[in-house]
Amino acid sequence: MSPAFNASPNQLTLALSKGRIFKETLPLLEAAGIRVMEDPETSRKLILPTSDPAVRVIIVRASDVPTYVQYGAADFGVAGKDVLMEHGMTGLYAPIDLNIARCRMSVAVPAGFDYANAVRQGARLSVATKYVQTAREHFAKKGVHVDLIKLYGSMELGPLVGLSDAIVDLVSTGGTLRANNLVEVEEIVQISSRLVVNQAALKLKRERLTPILDAFEKASAALA
């Protein structure tokens, strides 16, 4: 890590991803008296100042948030449970379910495909997903034989072009599934975003972190 980035031992760095998680984290930050001074949707900056000079926000890919926190490039961050299940929790402490960015991870298939019968018959299914580790564990527990195909987006396209029999993806309203003639057949897990903290930072910067964590916990409890 460069000395310029880690300029002050009192500096707190929060890792966030653009989009829904960023927007839904803003009220929690405001509850802690912290306001982000720039909008990542309009700014090209990846390090954003806040109203607290000792707190800054870095903008990273959602899947990279746990990595930045684990290795200490960020002291804390907000990541979906889906990301944490794939990444693992080494070096991380996840004290708070923030009750934001809620959705579910589910299995979906083309309308008309008899998923239950295929499973009963012991068919080997091809499944396209971004969440390979979680999907592998889910199907293994159910005794379903699958070939997992790693994709990074547009999961719904897999069954439409013959790449896969099914998909495992996040579902919110189900609108995208319906638009692509897919149906949700099995829920794997409910998803929400969690606050994750670097374990070393929790010890070394506890005095600075604790008021923010407490404010996040109180504000998120109101959303439950």
Swiss-Prot record:
**What is the reaction catalyzed?**
1-(5-phospho-beta-D-ribosyl)-ATP + diphosphate = 5-phospho-alpha-D-ribose 1-diphosphate + ATP
Per the record, the pathway is: Amino-acid biosynthesis; L-histidine biosynthesis; L-histidine from 5-phospho-alpha-D-ribose 1-diphosphate: step 1/9
Pfam families per the UniProt record, alphabetical: HisG
Q: State if Cytoplasm is listed as a keyword.
A: yes
Keyword list (alphabetical) reads: Amino-acid biosynthesis, ATP-binding, Cytoplasm, Glycosyltransferase, Histidine biosynthesis, Nucleotide-binding, Transferase
Q: Name one GO molecular function term.
A: ATP phosphoribosyltransferase activity
Keyword Acetylation annotated: no
Q: Which domain of life is it from?
A: Bacteria
List locations, semicolon-separated: Cytoplasm
| GO BP term, example | L-histidine biosynthetic process
What Gene3D superfamilies would the database entry show? Periplasmic binding protein-like II
- Please state the Enzyme Commission number of this protein: 2.4.2.17
Q: How does it assemble?
A: Heteromultimer composed of HisG and HisZ subunits.
Role noted for this protein: Catalyzes the condensation of ATP and 5-phosphoribose 1-diphosphate to form N'-(5'-phosphoribosyl)-ATP (PR-ATP). Has a crucial role in the pathway because the rate of histidine biosynthesis seems to be controlled primarily by regulation of HisG enzymatic activity.
Q: Which family, according to UniProt?
A: Belongs to the ATP phosphoribosyltransferase family. Short subfamily.
Instruction: Tell me the protein's name.
Output: ATP phosphoribosyltransferase
